[in-house]
A protein has these predicted regions:
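Well-ordered alpha-helical scaffold segments within catalytic/enzyme domains
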Residues: 54, 122-131, 158-174, 236-254, ...
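Catalytic-domain carbohydrate-binding cleft regions of carbohydrate-active enzymes
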Residues: 102-125, 129-144, 172-173, 178, ...
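Hydrophobic alpha-helical scaffolding
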Residues: 39, 79-83, 113, 126-130, ...
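The feature captures the catalytic groove of carbohydrate-active enzymes
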Residues: 15-26, 30, 146-157, 190-263, ...
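Carbohydrate-binding/catalytic loop surfaces
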Residues: 110-114, 118-122, 160-161, 165-169, ...
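Non-catalytic C-terminal accessory modules of carbohydrate-active enzymes
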Residues: 269, 359-500
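Extracellular/oxidizing-compartment recognition motifs
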Residues: 1-103, 107, 119, 133-141, ...
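Long, well-ordered core segments of solenoidal/helical folds
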Residues: 94-104, 131-151, 178-197, 263-282, ...
Length: 500
């Protein structure tokens, strides 16, 4: 059993790659005794099964598959549009959420099977794109509140995930219960009085509170990891403080709310003063211990700044996004347009959508370049499992679930069942169709589609059905001449707003 087929039979004659990239060896040897039955149970993540050495001819009628699985997450959810690639991405991410979710959000069932905060944030928001049942998300988050993992940014992202849970459910009981722990998920103790910036307390680059930036390390776009005050970490801290300010307000801790909001504002200003170059529109990777600025500029710095709202006004956000486009995102910039992992790409895409630059985000999301080695979702769909026919869900070749990395060159032990690659689901709902809750439990929501593309054809028409705790939001978009002509929303029985 395995996730891939071998290009040609290996020495033992097998076609299924049972000695997997992940280090698992999915090969079972059974000695069959005439007249006797046996049963076996294991949890394995595989796509192909090969039976070898049977003492009789095997026919399809002899095989029966039995599965134990959660209820389908797709009930009530629907998306269709005039972009075949976007429709394929919708199915790919829906299948990923449905088939990788058991009782806890984990990075992948085919390797660690561990829960991680950064993975859970993307998994959670992707799941909200298809289902209104938020129980698995809440259980996973509450597990992580008490069982943190090592990356420094992850303890900051978990507060954002906590607030997203409240906005999706309208239920504040989890925030009330866990607030004493959530309020401590900061690096305030490591704020430098001279610069106003913070660090994680771990200068060694490994172990608890080491700064991740991105994973695997080959996907960091050459990030200068020797800096003491890391731009990505500081941007994540701004987002974390703002999430805590909102959470504190919900649970009635108004003093804490004001303090966290003030910290977010002060840190934002410190980043812009110390790490941003107004002459170029670029962010440095960070400051060294002596206060000097790193000369290196990675794609991550601008992406995380846009995501976390690290800019003074919309004009500055436009400048940052425009510079990001010119430096690396435009097709003729040289090299890969996306210079981040499938995990980091979530922050890149959503940073662009959040600042109204959906035309740039869509150009990346719908990049049809599926040549070997490209960092595109098209490559993930059509190339990442090899050039073998796939019977799954109508996709001709490629991945059937989102992958851990863009390709195995960047991460040789990559899995082919990694929900942190499902950023496209969030991009479709919150970016392309622009549906966002504006009050807890979707009592009110906004609709602000972004269907343009800086390259290629825009999305001319589409429709989305989004399940929520209050019912299904139905949105249809019809465009012409680069403007949204109509947005129709069938609203569940609660107050709502719709804006073009």
């Amino acid at each position: 059993m395995g996730e891939q087929l071998c290009p040609e039979p290996v020495t033992d004659g097998t076609l299924v790659k049972w000695n997997m990239n992940t280090g698992n060896r999915y090969r079972l040897a059974w000695r069959l005794t005439p007249g006797r039955r046996f049963t076996t149970t294991d949890l394995m993540t595989f796509r192909f099964v090969e039976l070898i050495g049977l003492p009789f001819e095997l026919t399809p009628a002899m095989l029966r598959g039995v599965t134990v699985r959660r209820a389908s997450c797709g009930e009530g959810s629907h998306m269709d549009c005039d972009s075949p690639l976007l429709c394929d991405l919708w199915r790919l991410t829906r299948n990923t959420v449905e088939l990788t979710t058991q009782d806890l959000y984990v990075d992948s069932q085919s390797r660690e099977r561990g829960a991680y905060e950064g993975d859970a944030l993307i998994n959670q928001l992707a799941a909200y794109s298809f289902e209104s049942d938020c129980a698995t998300a809440r259980f996973s988050l509450e597990y992580l509140y008490a069982h943190r993992t090592w990356p420094a940014e992850y303890i900051l992202w978990i507060t954002e995930a906590a607030y997203e849970d409240y906005m999706a459910t309208g239920d504040d009981s989890s925030l009330v219960r866990w607030y004493p722990i959530l309020r401590g998920k900061t690096f305030s103790a490591f704020t430098d009085a001279d610069t106003g910036l913070l660090h994680s307390g771990n200068a060694g680059g490994a172990g608890t509170d080491a700064v991740l930036v991105d994973w695997p390390p080959s996907e960091r776009d050459g990030y200068d990891m020797s800096v003491r005050y890391n731009t990505v970490l500081n941007c994540a801290a701004v987002a974390g403080y703002e999430a805590l300010a909102r959470i504190a307000a919900v649970v009635g801790e108004t003093g804490d709310s004001g303090e966290f909001a003030a910290r977010a504002a002060a840190l934002r200003e410190a980043i812009l003063t110390r790490l941003y170059d107004p002459a170029t529109g670029d962010f440095s990777d960070g400051l060294y211990q002596d206060g000097s600025r790193s000369a290196h500029i990675s794609q991550h710095t601008a992406a995380y700044a846009l995501y976390a709202g690290v800019y003074r006004d919309s004009a500055m956000a436009d400048r940052i996004a425009g510079r990001l486009w010119e430096r690396s995102l435009r097709p003729d910039a040289g090299g890969s347009r996306i210079r981040m992992s499938v995990y980091g790409t979530y922050f890149l895409l959503m940073g662009l959508y959040r600042t109204g630059h959906g035309s740039m985000a869509n150009s990346l999301l719908l990049d049809g370049d599926s040549r070997p080695g490209q960092r595109t979702f098209s490559y993930m769909l059509r190339r990442s499992v090899g050039d073998f026919p796939s019977p799954f869900d109508g996709l001709p070749v490629g991945a059937t679930l989102t992958t851990e990395a863009w390709n195995s060159v960047n991460k040789p032990n990559m899995t082919f069942s990694h929900p942190w690659g499902a950023a496209a689901a969030v991009a479709i709902v919150r970016g392309v169709f622009g549906v966002m809750p504006t009050s807890p439990g979707f009592e009110t929501f906004s609709v602000h589609p972004q269907t343009e593309s800086m390259t290629g054809e825009p999305i001319l028409s589409g429709e989305l059905c989004l399940p929520t705790v209050r019912g299904i939001i139905q949105v249809s978009v019809s465009r012409g001449n680069c403007s949204v002509r109509f947005v129709g929303a069938s609203v569940p029985p609660a107050k709502s707003t719709s804006s073009e």
